[in-house]
Structures are given as C-alpha cells and as structure tokens.
C-alpha cells in the first residue's frame, strides 16, 4: 500500500527529528521572523536592539544635560542673564536695588510724651500758608491737575514735617477741581486714637479752581 505524502508542516517535523535539531515554527505567509527566531543559536554578542541603541547615546546629546551643563548653578538651575545682586540685598521687580529701610529705635512707649503731641491748630495754619503759596495765581487745567496735586502734597508734607513731633506719621490728601458754580462735599474718615492723633483740613478757592487739603497726624510706635 502506497504511503500518503505528508503535509509541509509534518514533513519538516519528521526531518527535524531525523537531524536532531529543533524544528522551526511554521509561520503564515507574509510574516517576518521574530527577534528570537532571527537570533543565532549558541554563545555570542547579542544584536543591538532599539532600546539599547537609545540608551547607548552619548549623555551630552540629551536635553537634560544641555540645561545642566558646566555653567549651571546650584540644583541644576541655569544662571540668570542679568547682573547678580550682592548677597543679602533687596531687589525690585525692575532689577534695581531698593532704598534701605528706615529704622527707628524702639522707645517702648505706647503714647507720646505730653510735650510732643500733634497740635491741630498749628498744623492748620501751616496748611493754609502752603495752599495760598501754591495756588494764588494757578489756573485749572485738566492736563496739569495731577502734577499740581502732587506738588501740593509734597509742599504740605515738607511744611508740616518741620512742625510735627517725632514718631508721627503724616497722611496728606488734596482734592482739586475747576470752579464752575457746582457744589462739592469732601469727606474723609479714619480709624485713629482721639487722644493721640489729629486732623487738619483747609479749603482754598480762587477765580479758576478750588482745593481741599486734609492731613492726618497719626502717632506711630
């Protein structure tokens, strides 16, 4: 009786048994062999894989090493492009050093000395003189009003600082407007100590404008 021909897969198994080697798996047509199948049997260096090639690149080509280089600062930070301020100095957002803070020695007092209290009547006279000197020939202009108000506040602050006792903080505000027959009410409110703090307010008018200046003298310890 004639033997039937074996299928291709069975024929390879029989041939592998005869030769004593491991049979190769049967793959469908159009499929490539895997890494284990393509790797040669026996000892020898393993072929370079994609993962190994990526890990084997030089460290100098990585983005992390480009940021953390020889010129990096502590903690891997890149140095600033601007000038480095001295250690312990304060710097503003513009990069310029700030003015040193004003320091006053503590007196361990919670109220002023009886002879060093803020006098509202004396401040009132100085405030009237400051407004008369700064506005006697002034004409109202919307473009120059802001500059004129700043100058008046500076003049009032200089005059009253010379008359105020130590440890008093002065808060000055000036309201300026055109004189056109309108009615204006200027009101100010403050949280203060009636026994130690004070207030002076003066209004001034000429043919073109009106002004209301208010100064609060607050005892600051």
UniProtKB/Swiss-Prot annotation:
A Pfam entry, by short name: Tctex-1
Stated name of the protein: Dynein light chain Tctex-type 4
Modified sites of kind Phosphoserine: 66
Organism of origin: Homo sapiens
Annotated effect of mutating residue 93 to A: Decreased colocalization with PPP1CC by 27%
SUBUNIT field: Interacts with ENG/endoglin, TGFBR2 and TGFBR3. Interacts with PPP1CC.
Intracellular or extracellular location(s): Cell projection, Cilium, Flagellum; Cytoplasmic vesicle, Secretory vesicle, Acrosome; Cytoplasm, Cytoskeleton, Cilium axoneme; Cytoplasm
Residue spans crossing the bilayer: none
Main location: other
Span list, region Disordered: 1-52, 65-87
Record flagged with keyword Nucleus: yes
Biased composition range(s): Basic and acidic residues: 10-21
Database matches in PANTHER family: DYNEIN LIGHT CHAIN TCTEX-TYPE 4, T-COMPLEX-ASSOCIATED-TESTIS-EXPRESSED 1/ DYNEIN LIGHT CHAIN
Organism classification: Eukaryota, Metazoa, Chordata, Craniata, Vertebrata
Tissue distribution of the protein: Ubiquitously expressed. Expressed in testis (at protein level).
Keywords recorded for this protein, A-Z: Cell projection, Cilium, Cytoplasm, Cytoplasmic vesicle, Cytoskeleton, Flagellum, Nucleus, Phosphoprotein
Top-level taxonomic group: Eukaryota
GO terms (BP aspect): microtubule-based movement
Alphabetical list of InterPro entries matching this protein: Tctex-1-like, Tctex-1-like_sf
Family listed: Belongs to the dynein light chain Tctex-type family.
One GO MF term: protein phosphatase 1 binding
A single cellular component GO annotation: nucleus
